[in-house]
């Protein structure tokens, strides 16, 4: 697996975060069906956003993690987004820029800004992550 870690141009790369991110991706690839190439970007996502995943045709296989999180805090969002990346890579989940989500063939129109966190976390692709994440973290950390 090829992993590229990217930090904003104006900030000094955090070697500890880069190392943790790379190791999480490597070990997760043994447990999840993931693309051969993944980029992990650290960026200023603002308060309340921990991370996001993007999988587009071609080479865009990107997980973005909030730069403000500590080394310990990045474990949860990276594993969460790796599961989403796996869902997309396997064809279970597709997300459009217009707020359309397709989960296992069923289309959902979702505006995360207009629903509660609890409602969002009960969406089927988020429920799938919730079911799988604890086990994945245990497998990674040991």
Predicted regions and their residues:
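Hydrophobic (often cysteine-bearing) scaffold residues that line and stabilize catalytic clefts
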Residues: 16-21, 75, 121, 125-128
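Metalloprotease/metallohydrolase-associated module, dominated by Zn2+-dependent proteases
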Residues: 32-38, 46, 92-142
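Short alpha-helical catalytic segment bearing the HExxH-like zincin motif
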Residues: 73-81
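Active-site scaffold of zinc-dependent metalloenzymes
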Residues: 43-73, 85-88, 93
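Hydrophobic or amphipathic, alpha-helical segments that drive membrane association/targeting
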Residues: 1-11, 32, 38-49
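Zn2+-dependent metallopeptidase catalytic core
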Residues: 13-36
